[in-house]
Structures are given as C-alpha cells and as structure tokens.
Amino acid sequence: IPPIADAIEEFVYHATNVDAAQKILSSGKLLSATKAYGKTGEELVIERKANGWEDPAHFYEYVMFGWGTHLVGDYVVLSEDFPCEEDFAKGNFDAGVRFYIRYKDIIKHKGHTFDGYHPIKVKDEISLFDYLFACIIPEQYKEQIEKHIPQELIAKVHYLPQRGLSL
C-alpha cells in the first residue's frame, strides 16, 4: 500500500461479499456492522476474532472505506471465506462487490470521521441514493444480485468479468 500522501484519489470504496451486497442493494443503504447485524460492537469483536480481526468495538459502529485502487476491501472479504492454496495457484480469487463513492462527496456526510487508518469512515449508515457513484459486481454474481437492485440505482451498477484474478 502506498503512503497516504501518494494515495489521495477521487474515489473511496466499501467492499463486501455477495450475500451482504444483496441486502445493501435491497435496502439502498450501506450499514455499519452493528446496524446490519443488530449486535453490539462487543459481540462483533468476539465473533470476528475467529477471522483474525482485532478491531475495537467502536469500529463496528462505522462503515469503513478504502482508497479506490487499493485491495484492502478485498482482503476483508477474503478473510470471511479464505480460498485454499490450490485456488490461489489457479487464480481463482473472486473479488468482492465494491460500492464506490466520490471522496469529495462523502466528506460532506454528517457522520464522517477520520481514524488515521481508513481514508474515511461514516457512523451508522450511508444512503446509496445520495452517495453511490458506482457499484462494481463480479460478473459471476449477476444472477444472484440483479433482482435486488432498486430501479433508481440500476444505471450505477456494472458487472465486470473477474474470474481468474490473483493476489
């Protein structure tokens, strides 16, 4: 990952798996983990330790973003269903679903803050209708996701072939 000074860009993104993406698109909102799962930050800390995450409880009250060209969001998605060594050798890495937002727009959100680690994070929720620039969905998930997309967001959703990617 390049130094922050070299990484300032136009977009930030939030990545997630296909199941969560269906719920996000259906609701039209990106939700913090505490809002999405109806659990406390403390409960989520205990659950997520199994996947190697050591985040403090208050992190789960925010929607986190990475810079638009960084892979960190895909690493988070991978940590929840890590591919085996054979999958990596064959290039069977499937990227997560990405929700891109213009940085200049999201810094105007009343719930935004900076933690020194993420480029930005937002407390509780973000309306896709107000902030989404583009949703990039791996082509292989199209049938699973397309029925969950609200009419108002269809023009912002794009499917890209992503089979055979490797880290």
What do the predicted segments below correspond to?
Residues 1-167:
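NAD-dependent ADP-ribosyltransferases
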